[in-house]
């Protein structure tokens, strides 16, 4: 399997509860390296641009409001098959359906407040990483 990079966002429900370290430990235990990380406060415009593909969905307004409600931690994870591995570590979007030991099973509060975001494809990973990081910020 190839070495990949993927974007991860630790969402406001998790940063508010000081879960960044526990979530990072899950990534590292799964063999993912954190090659870039920063804590930021998204603006409504930034959240709207990042989630533009969901603009016509009924949850878009709630999503962008939530993502700007508290700081988030954006990070680039690297490793063999990082995109799929990250999605496995995160667990199902709905924490009720997530496997034991996954981030969402342990930390998510609801489907909307599900603690983490992860890129779902190589194309999304490239686009999402470039949205938050310059090449100079990626140290691997």
Swiss-Prot record:
Name of the featured protein: Nucleoside diphosphate kinase
Principal place of residence: cytoplasm
UniProt keywords, alphabetically: ATP-binding, Cytoplasm, Kinase, Magnesium, Metal-binding, Nucleotide metabolism, Nucleotide-binding, Phosphoprotein, Transferase
Coiled coil: none
GO molecular function: ATP binding; metal ion binding; nucleoside diphosphate kinase activity
Active-site residues annotated for this sequence: 117 (pros-phosphohistidine intermediate)
A GO CC term assigned to this protein in UniProt: cytoplasm
Subcellular location: Cytoplasm
HAMAP family (alphabetical): NDP_kinase
Summary of subunit composition and partner proteins: Homotetramer.
Signal peptide: none
Binding site for ATP: 11, 59, 87, 93, 104, 114
Annotated GO biological process: CTP biosynthetic process; GTP biosynthetic process; UTP biosynthetic process
Keyword DNA-binding applies: no
Keyword Ribonucleoprotein: no
NCBIfam families, per the entry: PRK00668.1 (NF001908)
The reaction(s) this protein catalyses: a 2'-deoxyribonucleoside 5'-diphosphate + ATP = a 2'-deoxyribonucleoside 5'-triphosphate + ADP; a ribonucleoside 5'-diphosphate + ATP = a ribonucleoside 5'-triphosphate + ADP
Cofactor(s) the protein needs: Mg(2+)
Gene that produces this protein: ndk
